[in-house]
Amino acid sequence: MLKGRNLLDPMDFSLEELEEVFKLADEIIEEPEKFLHVCDGKILATLFYEPSTRTRFSFEAAMLRLGGQVIGFSEPNSSSVAKGESVADTIRTVGCYADIAAMRHPKEGAPAIAAMYSDIPVINAGDGSHQHPTQTLTDLLTIRSLKGDLSNLTIGCCGDLKFGRTVHSLVKALSRYKNNKFVFMSPEELKIPDYIRKEILEKNNIEYKEISKMEDAMAELDILYMTRVQRERFFNEDDYVRLKDSYILDGEKMKYAKKDMMVLHPLPRVNEIAYEIDQDPRGCYFKQAKYGMYVRMALIAKLLGVR
């Protein structure tokens, strides 16, 4: 039973609970008209302390398509945060008006702090370079829907693996399924963090390798998860400029890939995936964005206990 729970980390739900959410998402995709009023009278608060397009719109569209309503902010300067209000006080106040909250914050752990003080379910919509569990649910539903399984996969993660919270969450989640292995492709400065390598992979004897050339791994990958180098995570503009074009996926590199490989990307894209890949059936990132709305619909319905 997920009613009243928080989602702060992809490990918060068991595999059985994740499957509950995915099966409900399947039902919503199949017959969306059946869910048009399940959240009548319910309100979602979107508390976005960082810019967002897909995640915020996806949450808002999800709640509206369930018949609920949305309040919130997408720019903290337009709220009492600008006056110095704490996360704890913000969530306490929002809990007086809303039934569930989605929070994005630049500081790692901020949604967890909010959950400690909240009387309503809190969903982590991304905290700094830490975790992004609803993007992970999106990624898992996309893979499950298009591949048919979440096990026995070779997953390549490419780009900014140090600051890329979507990668951290995805590796944690996919490490729970059988016989998955990982290939990490990044500049030396943007390698996967030690805590992922040691606490998730090595501790659980999960096979992985780190390489520098994308072409060296393309032929073995079932999934290629691309990420952008995130300008907003750099303190030094010169470092960003030097690293931003490190890995670019184009048609030439795709020649090495399996015919049924999937290219995923949490978006936004800058230049790390050439536009020619949009016409390749293996480019699944816009399908992935749509699955994000459906999985958030299912998650909201489950946490509110309306399904």
UniProtKB/Swiss-Prot annotation:
Top-level division of the source organism's lineage: Bacteria
SUPFAM superfamilies hit by this protein: Aspartate/ornithine carbamoyltransferase
EC number: 2.1.3.2
GO cellular component annotations of the record: cytoplasm
Task performed by this protein: Catalyzes the condensation of carbamoyl phosphate and aspartate to form carbamoyl aspartate and inorganic phosphate, the committed step in the de novo pyrimidine nucleotide biosynthesis pathway.
Quaternary data: Heterododecamer (2C3:3R2) of six catalytic PyrB chains organized as two trimers (C3), and six regulatory PyrI chains organized as three dimers (R2).
Name of this chain's protein: Aspartate carbamoyltransferase catalytic subunit
Native species: Clostridium botulinum (strain Hall / ATCC 3502 / NCTC 13319 / Type A)
Taxon lineage: Bacteria, Bacillati, Bacillota, Clostridia, Eubacteriales
Gene: pyrB
